[in-house]
C-alpha cells in the first residue's frame, strides 16, 4: 500500500509541477466565461429581435391602418358627393314638378296683359 500511496504523491507532485490543477481550473473558468458570453449574446440578440419585431409590427400595422383609414375617408367623401348629387336631383324634381304650373301662371298673366 505504501507504494500506491507514494505513487499518488509522485503523481500529485508531477501534476502540480506541470500545472495540471491550474490548467483544469483555467479550463473550467474558460468554459464558464464562454457560456456566460454566449448567454449574454443570446439575451442581447433576443432583445434586439423583439424590438425589431415590435417596430416592424407597429409600423406595418400602423401603415396598414393609415392606408385603410385614408381609403375609408376617400369612400366616405365619394358617398358625400353622391349624396349631394341626389340632393340636386331632388331639387331638379321639385323644380320640374312645379315648372308646368309656373309656366301656366306666366301664360295666364301674359294673356291678361295682352288682353287675350
Swiss-Prot record:
Cysteines paired by S-S bonds: none
Taxonomic superkingdom: Eukaryota
GO cellular component: BLOC-1 complex; endosome
Localization of this protein: Cytoplasm
Coiled coil ranges: 63-95
Keywords: Coiled coil, Cytoplasm, Transport
GO biological process, one term: regulation of protein localization
InterPro entries per the UniProt record, alphabetical: CNL1
Quaternary structure and partners: Component of the biogenesis of lysosome-related organelles complex-1 (BLOC-1).
Function of the molecule: Component of the biogenesis of lysosome-related organelles complex-1 (BLOC-1), a complex that is involved in endosomal cargo sorting.
Similarity annotation: Belongs to the BLOC1S4 family.
Name of the featured protein: Biogenesis of lysosome-related organelles complex 1 subunit CNL1
Amino acid at each position: 500500500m505504501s507504494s500506491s500511496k507514494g505513487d499518488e504523491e509522485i503523481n500529485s507532485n508531477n501534476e502540480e509541477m506541470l500545472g495540471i490543477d491550474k490548467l483544469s481550473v483555467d479550463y473550467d473558468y474558460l468554459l464558464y466565461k464562454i457560456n456566460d458570453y454566449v448567454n449574454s449574446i443570446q439575451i442581447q440578440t433576443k432583445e434586439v429581435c423583439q424590438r425589431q419585431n415590435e417596430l416592424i409590427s407597429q409600423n406595418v400595422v400602423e401603415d396598414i391602418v393609415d392606408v385603410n383609414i385614408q381609403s375609408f375617408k376617400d369612400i366616405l367623401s365619394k358617398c358625400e358627393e353622391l349624396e349631394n348629387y341626389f340632393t340636386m336631383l331632388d331639387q331638379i324634381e321639385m323644380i320640374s314638378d312645379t315648372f308646368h304650373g309656373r309656366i301656366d301662371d306666366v301664360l295666364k298673366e301674359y294673356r291678361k296683359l295682352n288682353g287675350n
